[in-house]
Amino acid sequence: MIFDHYAAEVALLLSDVRIGDLLEVAAGSGAVTRVLAASMPEHVSITATDLNQAMIDRAIKVGTARSVQWQQADVMDLSFSDASFDVVVCQFGAMFFEPKSDAFAEVFRVLRPGGQFLFSVWNSIDVNDFAREVIRSLAEYFPGNPPTFFERVPHGYHNRQIIGNDLAEGGFTSIPVLEEKSFTSRAPTALHLATAFCMGTPLRSEIEQRYQGDLGDVVNFVSASVERRFGSSNLEGKMSATFVNLKK
């Protein structure tokens, strides 16, 4: 629903990498990993990591077009030697790192001189249609105590000056290239979208803290709001993110 376009964009931005060692951090269930495994030359070794072993197990089960080294790893304390990789990639994970400068310092450490760091972050919730409508409807459902996770975390790290400062604190001295990319996100039904956001993301825990009844009640309310805004099926909405690209 939201990751495929950006995974393809990662592969495009790395299309000039023909040989070397690539590390992906916060790989999740492997959306980017699968695209890279299918598009990168065999001479580029791929190591994909995530903090959550369950996510790695899921990614392994789905499989990749060629061999990938999967490993559980914490980006705050990577188990790799200094100067081990030519490229480090992270799609939609940097927003969760805390403190971010420490994570960037680890990336800097494992990169070889001249190595490339490419990561993406979501832009403001105001320019991400589906997320904005979900949050708006939840604020209506929980007046006075709306869930704030999406605005604080996934859509809370897009200030270019702050990103640049965090990278500098992590040791990077080159000027990052920041490029905004917008695509159309699609969902088969309003219910599918509401379920994905409310049940399949950390937003669920915020809902559970506020409602002890059947979570289906909340999902149905959000679904109805989404349907009024986007229709009941074949939904389309704008999504917007920024790619940050720099060298060590």
Predicted region positions:
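Conserved Class I S-adenosyl-L-methionine
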Residues: 29-31, 154-248
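A short acidic, Gly/Pro-enriched loop at the edge of an enzyme's catalytic core
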Residues: 76-87
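Conserved class I S-adenosyl-L-methionine
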Residues: 116-143
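A short SAM/SAH-binding and catalytic strip from SAM-dependent methyltransferases
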Residues: 86-100, 123
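Conserved alpha-helix/loop element of class I SAM-dependent methyltransferases that forms part
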Residues: 2-20
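Class I SAM-dependent methyltransferase SAM/SAH-binding core
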Residues: 21-78, 102
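A short glycine-rich, Lys/Arg-flanked "PGG" loop and its adjoining helix->strand segment in the class I
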Residues: 101-116
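A structural alpha-helix within SAM-dependent methyltransferase catalytic domains
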Residues: 11, 34-37, 104-108, 135
